[in-house]
Amino acid sequence: MDPRTRLDYALFQLTPTRTRCDLVIFSGGENEKLASGIFQPFVTHLKSVSDQISKGGYSVTLRPSSVGVPWFTKVTLQRFVRFVTTPEVLERSVTLEKEIEQIEDSIQANAAAIAGEAEGNELGGTWTSQKSTALSKTKGETDGDTVEENSKVGLQRVLENRKAALCKEQAMAYARALVVGFELDYMDDLFSFADAFGASRLREACVNFVDLCKRKNEDRMWVDQITAMQAFPRPELTFMGDSGIVLAGEENDLLNATNVKHGNSMDASSQGSFETGQEGRAQMAMPWPNQFPQYMQNFQGHGYPPPYMFPGMQGQSPYFHGNMQWPVNMGDVESNEKSSKKKKKKKKNKKKSKQDESAEPSDNSSTETESEDGNEGKKQSRKVVIRNINYITSKRNGAKESDSDESGEEEGFVDGDSIKQQVEEAIGSVERRHKSTSHRQRKHKSHNGDDDSSNKETKGNDNWDAFQNLLLKDNDSEPEELLRISSTALNMASEVVRKREPPSDDSFLVAIGNEDWGRETSIEKFNAGENVRIIRKGNNYDEEMLNPGRSDESRSYSQAEMSVHDGKLRTRNEAEEDWFIRNQAGPETDPSLVKTFVGDHFHLNKSSERDVLTDDSFMIHSRVENQVEDSRLRTEIMDLDVYGTTQQENSAPENTPHEPDDLYMVLGREQDVKPTLLPWTPEIDFETNTLAQRTSRIDLITATKASAGEQTLDGKEKKSRGISKGKDAKSRASSRPDPASKAKRPAWGSRAAVSKSKSEMEEERKKRMEELLIQRQKRIAEKSSGGSVSSSLASKKTPTVTKSVKSSIKNEKTPEAAQSKAKPVLRSSTIERLAVARTAPKEPQQKPVIKRTSKPSGYKTEKAQEKKSSKIGQSDAKSVELSRDPSLEIKETVVEDSHSYLSEKQVDALPAVASVDDFKDIKELHSLPSEETARVKNRPNEIIAEKVQDQTKIDDQETVKNTSVSEDKQITTKHYSEDVGEVQASQEKPVSPKKSVTFSETNMEEKYYFSPAVSEIDISTPPATEADHSRKKWNSEETSPKATAKVFRKLLMFGRKK
């Protein structure tokens, strides 16, 4: 944005804490952030801001009284922000001016005093004023008058110097004000800004600065000083304080400003000697304060650190000091010390070797020198021994005579006594080195403890014997055998070579790597006098611990476990519970066992008892799976009855201790035990089986009760139907998954459990299917007891029809129906009432009863339907479309007096003249379920025990299609006319629209599709066990064979008419 752009308003956007703010200026549709920082200085300088912030809020607006004023611009706000940041930019010049005026007054007073004293003697006064300093230095006069005169002159000179320094500082402050923008031409805008928003301090500073400038511009010396100060580069002239307010675009200037005091641009007290060299020094190109050498180009530099971080400011590292030199390499100091010690030692060895050379004969001086060097250095002593061994073994083992010249020379060179002396000295040096190391580590006494000459002689002879054994050894000997023989010879007088104190007296070998991670091998204990090969554990990482075997000796087992990780051998001490204990034959019952803890070792001290059987059980704390390294320490998950594990040979534990997850008991250490499978939890399976058996038992009990309820009388039929309906709901609910069974399912962790659960689920599914079939058959039997397929469908779809049928059944009871229980007559429609009326001619006394009961029952049925239809609506007119045969459909027609279920093709194809035949077919359609219901009531258990899928429904469907019923069709003319009239009247009613209704999924678990091809004998012929009952049916006049033949003929004719 242009600095001269007129602003609409300025906005202070505060933070939630109202301690910091961003100053944003707005001009037209543009806005720009002008500054950011601490909010308190603005509150102090602007009265309008303090008034607005006292009211609350998170924003303060600076808006002039009139719009578009010329002084409210961006540059005016920038000058105001600079003044708020450093008020001394205007006030410093005025302050210095006041101080200069005071110094001028002092100079004048001092000059007057000096002039008054010098009135009597002008020459003396002049001479004193000019030469006071020279006289005091040369002569050193002690006269009081002379010293007083010299002090006044000195004070005068100091005041003049101070005045000059203040004048230059004032000129510098003025130059800074001009550079920042506080020029006289722009002071009017600042006056207007101060008057509009109540910036009283700004107005006062501007007034004083303008007055000062007017006075100084007349002074030629002032103008020259201003010109000199303006020659300074910009970073020196930019004055930045630590007020915490930063203008946009001046972050780098703030970072580069260093060593600046708050409120001071230059300390006037440091300008006492600023007289002669200041001008020349001011002309020099001042270096930037943060320029660093080439190797520090990436360092951002240390500016004056602000008390806050503002946007765009780069972070600085507070740990680097720019003027600090590179640190001294402390490792070089140690290496220098070590190298100096080595040099001193080498010099000492050289001196000693020179003395030995002077004492030895000249012919073998070189050999003796090397042997003496071997006493001090292990490497040189080895060289001597190896050289002599190679030479002598080559000669002792039969060297060729071809090189006789060389052999002759070497035989003259080698002497047996000298060789023997050299070997003794070499071996003695080795022993002395072992002595020094063992003495430093507080071991046993070394071999050199005795001063007796005889003991030394015996010792030397033993060393020579060991050397002869080495010489007599053939060339094919392995280096390990040589090491074994030499170690046996060296371990004389029960010498124990140990690098570390063992926990107890035990032949327990542990390889412990030193700081070089396994390059060297130390032996904790080596029993004296035993011919045991030294095992270098640094190379055998798979055998970290040598267990001495089963014995009853006192044992000590260290809790320090060894691990090999990434090819490195290391030893660590485990924490509290990451350990294992090898039990020794019942420690809690053995009084001879003493348990002690020494450091990190666990001691088991026990007296030797040969008769006690050793227990090799381990108590092992398990590890987390993701924390165990790849090793042989693996604990298999044990079965509940069988325990087995592999032998735990070594372990690679984790680097950090941890809490164990579980505790396992491992019995035995047989390696041939195979890991068992995941455990089978019998208690979980038992709960599942128990739940399944309980469910099946409840279903069987309910089915038995329902079947027993079907054998009751017709008066209790309503109660039995209610129980069967509740039973259907329960059977449908049982097909859903039980939440309790879900909770008791076995865990899915093992394969055995999964396979067992699958088999059980299959068995349960089969049982459930059988139970569903039994329930289906019982529901079919209940529908058959209802009187017909149509009544059963209507009873399932609409409760009003069921109620009307039940009411008609109750009203139509006759003495004959009450007496003959084997053949109940269920009248649920006009067709069934007509069928009952046909049996009336044999018993005339029952005719009026039948007529009276049929008509009111029809009336009641019609009223019940009309009463309930308002609640149910059109649901009563829905028909059921059976998917058993595509050519078969059932249509439901609702009439006033009855419900007639006719075949759709019969209604469409047959004329009204054939209504009598249709009536007979329909009557036969509804009469068969009554007979089958009687048979079902006599044998309920046989229906429940029936196996197969949909046999009873197939029977019902076949009955609907074939209508093979034997019933007498001969009726009287009177009843025939009445019945035909009723049928014709019912056909005159409008037929309800066709509506396909499918069986609900809640009534059966699956959709069953039935085949119509079923034998008629299965439908019409009753079982052989009911011979008496069937004989009654066939001997009756209604169901005579003659009537059956008529029915078959009608069926054949019915097929032709189609």
Curated annotation (Swiss-Prot):
Motif Nuclear localization signal 1 boundaries: 340-347
Source domain of life: Eukaryota
Compositionally biased tracts (Basic and acidic residues): 447-462, 757-773, 860-869, 878-887, 1026-1040
Keywords assigned by UniProt, alphabetized: Activator, Nucleus, Phosphoprotein, Transcription, Transcription regulation
Annotated segments matching region Disordered: 123-147, 262-281, 330-463, 708-887, 1020-1041
PANTHER family the UniProt entry points to: COP1-INTERACTING PROTEIN 7, COP1-INTERACTING PROTEIN-RELATED
Primary location group: nucleus
Compartment(s) where it occurs, according to its Swiss-Prot or TrEMBL record: Nucleus
Biased amino acid composition, Polar residues: 126-136, 262-276
Short motif Nuclear localization signal 3, span: 764-771
Protein name: COP1-interacting protein 7
Chain intervals with Acidic residues compositional bias: 403-414
Coiled-coil regions listed: none
Basic residues biased stretches: 340-353, 432-446
Segments of skewed composition (Low complexity): 783-808
Function: Exhibits transcriptional activation activity. Positive regulator of light-regulated genes, probably being a direct downstream target of COP1 for mediating light control of gene expression.
Disruption phenotype: Defects in light-dependent anthocyanin and chlorophyll accumulation, as well as defects in the light control expression of light-inducible genes involved in anthocyanin biosynthesis and photosynthesis.
Motif (Nuclear localization signal 2) on chain: 431-438
Entry keyword annotation includes Transcription: yes
Gene Ontology terms: biological process: anthocyanin-containing compound biosynthetic process; chlorophyll biosynthetic process; positive regulation of DNA-templated transcription; response to light stimulus
